[in-house]
Amino acid sequence: MRNIGIKEDVIREIVELAEKHDLKKVILFGSRARGDFQRASDIDLAVSGGNAAMFAVDVEEETSTLLQFDVVNLDLDLQEKLLESIKKEGMVLYEKVWELHC
């Protein structure tokens, strides 16, 4: 994995919040995913499923980083250029795995 400048603890907190808010997927994109970030660059996340709005609030308030987050909801209509960027450079941080109960 390339250097994205985010501590493992913060990634773990993002995953825990994704599970808490029943998200299907969390994708890191932007300068951190590309590896050309600056020390104070924000953390760009694209999310789908669940309660994306509350995830966006909690990720700002409950993670142990001073970095800012920019969260976009993939379930809403987004500009095609932004979607292409997410698909091209995105790194999946979390994806819900479905369990079959027989």
Model-based region annotation:
Residues 1-25, 33-39, 48-102:
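Catalytic core of pol beta-like nucleotidyltransferases
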